[in-house]
Amino acid sequence: MTYKGYLIDLDGTIYKGKERIPAGEAFVHQLQERQIPYLFVTNNTTRTPEMVQEMLAGQFNIETPLDTIYTATLATIDYMVDMNLGKTAYVIGDVGLKHAIAEAGFVEDTVNPAYVVVGLDWEVDYEKFSIATLAIQKGAHFIGTNPDLNIPTERGMMPGAGALNALIEAATRVKPTFIGKPNAIIMDKAIAHLGLERGEIGRAHV
């Protein structure tokens, strides 16, 4: 192995949709056998790290410790803590994203939050968009969990978190700070979690 540690994309490296990618599975097993540190990095905010861990074990034959899974949700929280703008937030997103941000000590504020965080929300509606728009107009820091405009589903390419952010950007004329891949924030945070220098880390991705 060339590097002292690896960042591994899930979709396209370990699986494609529900289909296993044997080469990705074999690569992770090699890292584990050689005790080379690695971190799975994913833009998905609808799954908690525990859910990702269970999915990898149950569907893709990869047993991995919880601390080897780094999601855009975790990177978003790390970024919010670093920014230190306050402990209030309005979140558009799945229950997992909202719960994780609350667990990190951020209190929901629908009027004047320090942050507006927008991730994938299967039940988004006009009122949620309105609350976010008004808060950003008042000065809330606008964060997008990831810029993915579409997500592949069995029905076809559906709107992703990036599409929801684009609507709010159009309404506020404020660009969100995107956390997830391919942006630098999630990768910088992941590198910090591995505790290695950038040049010592390889990346396994599509």
Residue ranges and their predicted role:
Residues 1-10, 14-205:
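HAD-like aspartate-dependent phosphatase fold
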